Amino acid sequence: MGELAKEILPVNIEDELKQSYLDYAMSVIVGRALPDARDGLKPVHRRVLYAMSELGNDWNKPYKKSARVVGDVIGKYHPHGDTAVYDTIVRMAQPFSLRYMLVDGQGNFGSVDGDNAAAMRYTEVRMAKLAHELLADLEKETVDWVPNYDGTEQIPAVMPTKIPNLLVNGSSGIAVGMATNIPPHNLGEVIDGCLALMDNPDLTVDELMQYIPGPDFPTAGIINGRAGIIEAYRTGRGRIYIRARAVVEEMEKGGGREQIIITELPYQLNKARLIEKIAELVKEKKIEGISELRDESDKDGMRVVIELRRGEVGEVVLNNLYAQTQLQSVFGINVVALVDGQPRTLNLKDMLEVFVRHRREVVTRRTVYELRKARERGHILEGQAVALSNIDPVIELIKSSPTPAEAKERLIATAWESSAVEAMVERAGADACRPEDLDPQYGLRDGKYYLSPEQAQAILELRLHRLTGLEHEKLLSEYQEILNLIGELIRILTNPARLMEVIREELEAVKAEFGDARRTEIVASQVDLTIADLITEEDRVVTISHGGYAKSQPLAAYQAQRRGGKGKSATGMKDEDYIEHLLVANSHATLLLFSSKGKVYWLRTFEIPEASRTARGRPLVNLLPLDEGERITAMLQIDLEALQQNGGADDDLDEAEGAVLEGEVVEAAEVEEVEGETAELVAEPTGAYIFMATAFGTVKKTPLVQFSRPRSSGLIALKLEEGDTLIAAAITDGAKEVMLFSSAGKVIRFAESVVRIMGRNARGVRGMRLGKGQQLISMLIPESGAQILTASERGFGKRTPLSKFPRRGRGGQGVIAMVTNERNGALIAAVQVQEGEEIMLISDQGTLVRTRVDEVSLSGRNTQGVTLIKLASDEVLVGLERVQEPSGGDDEDLPEGEEAAESLGESAESESEPAAEAEGNEE
């Protein structure tokens, strides 16, 4: 080794690795992976287009074999594998890959299904017409040239493009330590942005977005939301969500069934793989409701048909497809391109400025080139015009010269008469056609014209037919045109405004010829898929057991039964657990769950897991952050979204006028009461409130808006005395009436307005005075014409007209609502009902009965009622809930067998008891 090396230098291996890797990285970055910000092309694209141009493979000429182009590219300009070059050509010829194709292909160039292109020996290509705009004026010294890999050829360092190709067709690539991913855009919109920036260089990115609203993909689709676009245009980085275009329509012969039609896909999505993925999800039952899936795409366009089963909601299935497949996909924008040979992250304005600056340089260099050529041509014409005006002496001089060289020297040495061109030269300027490097001794001087060597040579080469008078006139006319052209070129070079005008005219011409309509729709506000979008909207029965287990079931799972029926088991009870709360709620509704400790929690109905009738459900502690010993005591259904839109989400309104801030219970003595009426009602503004009642008889009214901002850890709804619990809550408007029922069968009815508005931290005021061992069991907000249905723990109940319940002042003991004795047991619930409605009854052993209100006898307050549900000796009734159905009677659905007979028999037995219908003292 010592004989071969002149000198050996010790090098630290870490330093050498750093330098060598840096050299390699920069080679990949500059020479392979990143596009130039000026023409938007990577080296391989630039070399392919240049090779096709050199081959004369123009848009208006016959196709050439792809292999021919690939061979020229790898042989002259791109020393890499033929596969990489051919893949580049294929991509530039695919209408689903490039927004504006640069190569016109003939043959199989692949498909959106991921099919590969045919081998290069089978396909043919030529440049697309648009590609010529990238190479326009290349021969006019508009760009720098660099040697190819072996120094035998010269190739352009950048294309003199008239098209802002970086934005128009985008680019993607992975370099060392960096990557780029630029989406395509609409040509007309990008040119409009360029023109606007040329008119006002101070435009901001946001102002430029008025002209360039967002990417425009070749496969169309829908961009979901503008936030990602704005971020990417401002910073060069962002994420946009692209959705397929799909519609839900009713099948022509489907008997009411729906089908989903997909006509556009997100950019770069493989259609065949998408269909396979959907089929896989259906097979795994991750997406339900799809009965058939087929691809009906043809030469006229894309069409994927998804047929649904009867009863399935198309929008819900489509939302599930968006969530679980690439029908909605993310395009990560990362605008990294080479500027002055260095990688830079560019925002929207940066990209447009780089292109406009490039066009200014190209047009300037082209104008300088054209001016030089025009002056050279004008100089020759000037000499020929002088010769023609002195034709006889010139011919005589040439005839008398022994050799062409001597004739040339004598032509140069002679001073010629120049009257034919002198006037034109004076008008255009003495130096108008004078080449910059021409010796001062030549040209017009002292009234005579001295020919240059170039002019003398042109005269010697002049053909005889040019000596005719007509040709003489043509020559002078051409000379005048050259002078005019030179004047225009000089104006372009000396007047920046005229230079920008030329650039504008060329951009407008490109837009007029190649501009087209936008394909991709942009949805202004992002439509985020939430869990609610994936859930079919339906009424559900939500139950919470005494042991703290929650579940939901479709309301349709229960059929109406006759009064006294044994019913269906609503849940599987273990360890003597029983259903304590039941609510019929929409699957998309928000539930306010009030706990025994005075806190409120938020849950969407669909967040409560669905379970069968015999299943126990899921522990509430897995759904809510409940403390030890804390249990849910009330549920309330609200439209949270509407509440937030209409009322905002003020955290605390405790300082509102009239609010009770102290944590003490306000005694009833504060309100003067008279027999049956309240002496004075406090005037309050109308609005939405939550009216709450506790087991100790305390009530409180708080603005609903204070519960419109969900907290994951819950929120204090009211402060409680030790041992007290919340038993009911309802939404009111501030002008309703309130009815409180106690376990002793008593009820008190008073105006809501006597209860002042209070903040969340207040304890409330006395609503009903209770005896020892008694507690509130129900609170109702009565409606006009309603009837009150009460039920006792032994399964007896009755209906009583609302008019039978007198109004009393807040804080009293109330009047009898239902007789409580050994037969009936304590009062467990009261609900208000209307004719034609249904109720649900639940026992502590999980038995559930759904029956019509009409089958419960209508009677006065001081009565015992009739049998509502047949209970075992060790079974008690614990729940009563009103069920409201949208429409239609269910008479035909009522069971007519054993349960019906049994319920009718029970009814007769109950009504035969004298005590059941005996009227007593209404007080």
Swiss-Prot record:
Renumbered residue ranges of the record's region Disordered: 881-923
Entries under Pfam families matching the protein: DNA_gyraseA_C, DNA_topoisoIV
A single GO cellular-component term on record: cytoplasm
Show the InterPro entries listed in the entry. Answer: GyrA (IPR005743), GyrA/parC_rep (IPR006691), Gyrase/topoIV_suA_C (IPR035516), Topo_IIA-like_dom_sf (IPR013760), Topo_IIA_A/C_ab (IPR013758), Topo_IIA_A_a_sf (IPR013757), Topo_IIA_dom_A (IPR002205), Type_II_DNA_Topoisomerases (IPR050220)
- At the top of the EC hierarchy, this enzyme's class is isomerase
Compositionally skewed regions (Acidic residues) per UniProt: 888-901, 908-923
Q: Which SUPFAM superfamilies match?
A: GyrA/ParC C-terminal domain-like (SSF101904), Type II DNA topoisomerase (SSF56719)
Motif interval(s): GyrA-box:
561-567
Catalytic activity field: ATP-dependent breakage, passage and rejoining of double-stranded DNA
Domain Topo IIA-type catalytic: start-end pairs: 34-534
Name the keywords, alphabetized: ATP-binding, Cytoplasm, DNA-binding, Isomerase, Nucleotide-binding, Topoisomerase
| Annotated GO MF terms | ATP binding; DNA binding; DNA negative supercoiling activity
Q: What biological process terms from GO does the record include? A: DNA topological change; DNA-templated DNA replication
Q: What else is known?
A: Few gyrases are as efficient as E.coli at forming negative supercoils. Not all organisms have 2 type II topoisomerases; in organisms with a single type II topoisomerase this enzyme also has to decatenate newly replicated chromosomes.
How it assembles, according to the record, is:
Heterotetramer, composed of two GyrA and two GyrB chains. In the heterotetramer, GyrA contains the active site tyrosine that forms a transient covalent intermediate with DNA, while GyrB binds cofactors and catalyzes ATP hydrolysis.
Q: Which NCBIfam families does the record match to this protein?
A: gyrA, PRK05560.1, PRK05561.1
Mind telling me what this protein is named?
Answer: DNA gyrase subunit A
What lineage is on file? Bacteria, Pseudomonadati, Pseudomonadota, Gammaproteobacteria, Pseudomonadales
